[in-house]
C-alpha cells in the first residue's frame, strides 16, 4: 500500500505504515524477473519499443474471438452514452499516449476529451463535470503524480479507469 515499508529478513518480513506494524495480505505477482529486467537492451524505453508488437497482439488476443471474428470487451461501470467528458492523465511517455488517445476518442466516440499532465492535475484542480470519466495511464501503475491525479479525480466524483501493465499496482487498485 501507499506509504508502507517492509523489513525483510531470512525468516520473513514485517510491514510498517509509519512506525506502526500492519498486517497485509501477501500476494505473489505474476511477473517474472525476465519481464522486469531490460534484457539485452541499453535502456527500458528501447525494450518497451521493441516489445510493442507482442504486447499489442497479446492484449488484443484476450478480447478477440477468432471463431466469430468479434471483439468482446469487459463490462464497464458506466454507460458511455452518459459520459459528459473524458479526462486522460499520465506522465512522461504515458502523457503522449493520452494525447494520441484524445484524437481517437474525439474522432471515433465523438466525446469531449481533456488531457492533463499527471504532475499538474491536482495542483491545477480543474473543475470536473458530473458524469465524467478519468482514464489514468501508467506503465508501472505506481507513478506517484499519476496516482495523485487518480485520487483527485475520485475526490471529484469521476469514474476512474486505468491502463497499466501491473494489475497489482496502486493505480489499478484505486481505479474502478
How would you label these PLM feature ranges?
Residues 1-81, 94, 106-108, 123-127:
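N-terminal segments that mediate ammonia production and transfer
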Residues 81-175:
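Glycine-rich phosphate-binding loops that contact phosphosugars or nucleotide phosphates
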Amino acid at each position: 500500500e501507499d506509504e508502507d515499508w517492509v523489513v525483510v529478513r531470512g525468516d520473513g518480513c514485517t510491514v510498517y505504515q509509519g512506525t506502526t506494524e500492519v498486517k497485509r495480505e501477501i500476494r505473489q505477482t505474476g511477473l517474472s524477473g525476465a519481464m522486469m529486467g531490460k534484457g539485452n537492451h541499453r535502456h527500458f524505453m528501447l525494450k518497451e519499443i521493441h516489445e510493442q508488437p507482442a504486447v499489442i497482439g497479446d492484449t488484443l488476443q484476450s478480447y478477440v474471438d477468432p471463431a466469430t471474428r468479434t471483439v468482446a470487451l469487459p463490462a464497464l461501470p458506466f454507460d458511455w452514452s452518459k459520459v459528459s467528458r473524458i479526462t486522460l492523465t499520465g506522465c512522461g511517455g504515458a502523457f503522449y499516449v493520452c494525447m494520441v488517445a484524445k484524437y481517437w476518442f474525439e474522432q471515433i466516440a465523438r466525446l469531449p476529451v481533456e488531457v492533463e499532465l499527471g504532475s499538474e492535475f491536482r495542483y491545477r484542480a480543474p473543475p470536473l463535470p458530473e458524469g465524467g470519466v478519468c482514464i489514468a495511464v501508467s506503465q508501472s501503475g505506481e507513478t506517484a503524480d499519476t496516482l495523485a491525479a487518480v485520487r483527485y479525480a475520485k475526490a471529484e466524483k469521476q469514474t476512474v479507469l486505468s491502463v497499466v501493465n501491473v494489475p497489482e499496482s496502486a493505480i489499478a487498485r484505486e481505479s474502478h
